Amino acid sequence: MPVFYRKDMMPMSQFSELLREYIKNKDITIKALAEKCGIDRTYLHKILKGERKVPSVDFVENISLQLMLSTEDKSRLMELYNISEMGEDVYNRRKQVSKIIHDMANTNMEEPDALTFKTEVDIDSVPEISIYTDKRELRKNLQVLICSDVHNGSDIQVIAQPTEFLTNLLSIAAEGSESTINHLFFFDNTSGEKNTAKYNLDIFPFICHLAQKHEKYEAFYYYEGASAYFNSTNIMPNIMITNNFLIRTDSDYCEGVIYRSKPMVEFYMRQFEKFKTKCAKLLDHAVDILEYVYFWYDDNANFIGVDFQPCTMLCLTEDIYNAHALLPADAKKFVKAKLTMGKKALSEHKFVNLFSEKGLAEFMTTGEIFELPRNSYTFPTLAERKIMLQIMISLCENGMADYRIIKDDYFAVSKNLCINISDNTSLNIVARNNCFSDFSYLKISETSLVQAFWDYFQHFIDSDAVCSHEETIEILRSYL
């Protein structure tokens, strides 16, 4: 039978009430359950009354097993336990970050299908003012007119909150073009809210998806109270400007006005540029491996990296690097200098690298290095790979780096995504296509996003999802 909860109930009370409901449904006495679990009956009574904290996740696992709970019921009980341990805001934020990572790992980096509709528009045939009160008509004309202008070399200026529709519209319009998209929006900094990162994390995937697809997508943000913004009487808050069109719509793209007017376009462009100067740049793109290496080793802070494979760049000897790097001489020298800086930083800052054992096995079997595009190096030999693995083990044993294996049962690490985060400084995201020939490099420095990801991985490292330092070293040794 379904169980319902009041929003004003404390997390432990919710846990206790749900557990009481499960016990009642299973028709088992408290005494019998306590004996099955090997715990004191009085202690279990106090937990069921919400007078005692649940001692550990093992307790929840054990009692779920003894009650023979379904996967869904156990998951709900575990969720309430985690909420009681972390607090609801922290739990929801970490859950949100986990979902963002999962979605980014499954983003399709391949080229989308070509547009199947006509994008050429006779500008003179478009009315000077077009008013739309039908959502389908408005959205169709937005796509046609913006795509037509971009096809003829126009950039796009946007003031609007990131949404799925806007991301799809701009992705379609920018596909295959060299046009720049300048996008202005706000991040929430509502005073007094416990979890101001929630709204920012809500819109971040839309921004990130577009940035990974289009190198010339430039995102700028300012701070605003989200509740004040959405409760305001601002009419037609969304603004889009191309060479020939000024577009204003409501927040949901259901109604709007499209102006074909050069004076209007020029006036709003001047206002847009003024507003842009008051905004901060959200992200930087790296267009090649050299810029990415600069991003990676430029942060002077503690560092967590998450990838399918272990980080092998810090394990390259000079001989191995010189033998396999397929770069021009000046680029080869630059990357080598940055790698030296990265190794030196290990003596001053903490570096944690999370990876999968499958990734380790694949590197030791093939020599492929997922951190680099395939056209930038040749694969190290088996003997060289063993030297690199020995260096990796040495870094772990000497406390220079903390390599940790993620257990596949808890977290599926993707080949298509690498995340590197510096302690409250920056978030670096690398997305790869399925052929590992095209990489997207992004660096984000907005505080609420960086702190949310840093907190998530700090918690994740200490969870049962990750092998201990000693367990990881033992597994690494098994591949020598």
Protein language model features and the residues they cover:
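A short, Lys/Arg-rich alpha-helix, primarily the initiator
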Residues: 2-29, 36
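Short alpha-helical "recognition helix" segments of helix-turn-helix
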Residues: 32-34, 63
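Recognition helix of helix-turn-helix/homeodomain-like DNA-binding domains
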Residues: 38-55, 62, 78-82
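Short amphipathic recognition helices of helix-turn-helix/homeodomain-type DNA-binding modules
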Residues: 57-61, 65-115
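The feature captures two recurrent sequence modes
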Residues: 101-132, 136
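Hydrophobic protein-protein interaction segments
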Residues: 126-478
